Amino acid sequence: NYYSNSIAFGNAFIGWNYKVLTENLHTCTLAEGCDYVADKIHDEADREVVSVLDKILTESGYTRKKGDFNEGPSVRYYCGKSSVYDYALNSDTGNLYLELRIRNAEKCLAYLRECPESIVEVFRHSDAGCQNRMNGTCRYGVKYEFEKEEKWHCGCCGAPFKLHPIKEDIPHYLKLLELGRSK
């Protein structure tokens, strides 16, 4: 039974899984691979994004591992033997998000001219950071200047750049991470 207490509390997000409706609460199967996230996504186009991006990344040599962040299940993609993921696909109460571990946003800025407005908007956004930024001990935040304003993306609790992915924009996500992967 996949809904035993240990599984239920290890993956309390089973309630978002459509399989609860097609199977039942006590026999609902939990998916493996990228379907671990896709099964919790409500939109068919978003499930397709998960599948397409997973195929591209795994065929490019990335290693896929399950992860659960605070808001829902995730699948994380690691390059080589790195202990830090480059990409993550997250289901936040059924909404899909892609995390990009861009460490040097400055290297991405020229390429943004080729990107759709939805991606450019992610770089316009700035967040306040967490307590580590406030006390001067942050090692993972990304600071850059965009459109003559200083921007900040906290990277302490996840990858600094988070967006709702669109299938047609996948090549842009890959290129942005390629450009901004290293400091």
Regions found by a protein language model. Name each.
Residues 53, 163-165:
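Phosphate-binding beta-loop-alpha motif at adenosine-nucleotide cofactor sites
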Residues 5-86, 92-95, 125:
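Charge-rich, low-complexity N-terminal segments
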Residues 68-160, 168-183:
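Short, conserved beta-strand/beta-arch hydrophobic-aromatic motifs that form part
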